[in-house]
Amino acid sequence: MGSVRASSLTLANRSGDVKCSVAYLLYFSFAMTPKSKPGKRAPRKGPRVKLVAQAALPTRHGRFTIYGFKGSGPEEEAIALVRGKLDGKTAPLVRVHSQCLTGDVLGSLRCDCRAQLELSLKKIGQAGSGLLLYLPQEGRGIGLMNKLRAYQLQDGGMDTVEANETLGFAADARDYDFSAQILKKLGATKIRLLSNNPEKVRQLEESGIRVVRRVACQPRVSKTSRAYLQTKKSKMGHLLDGL
């Protein structure tokens, strides 16, 4: 894969460095990009995946390289955090993570998104190599405002699946073909996938990625997120233990 030259970036104020979480930086890298309506895709023209930039990203889980990718459609953009070298021979540990402003950045306990993000980075850091894809798929692909509307319905007694469907969306509107193209560009065509979602495994394999092993990504369950996770297990087939 080709490389893009990038200068180092320091965030600082008068009193010293500003400390931002990885989740905060990842989420707001997408914040200023115009989004089309959920489920609407522009016609694809030209190459599916374009490397836009790369830079060093030291984190508390180790040193990563951060890559920015864009595709042909307005919603096709993603960030990859790569640790170590991807030699194409071994199967790296991979997390394909959908952004969640309320969880990843604001610390919401309605879901386990932030806990999964942190657990994934920790595992990849400890392994010494691997990668995390961070995708703008807020609310399982329905967008931030619609996710908040779904929250409002859940406050009225619906579960996460019923709320999405009441709003006219699928329970899970995400597509992982773009993710697969990025993995191929990075040379990760066979992987160990950090996921509890068999649908994610299926879609990646259909797009040409060999998932040699699914690695459970199940942080400790909180009282607040238990019902949400039970719904994902019973209605969406997620592989979750102890629920």
Predicted region positions:
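Short terminal hydrophobic/aromatic SLiMs and anchors at protein ends
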Residues: L11-R14, V22-Y27
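A general marker of short, structured functional hotspots
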Residues: C20-A23, D172
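Catalytic domains of riboflavin
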Residues: F28-L243
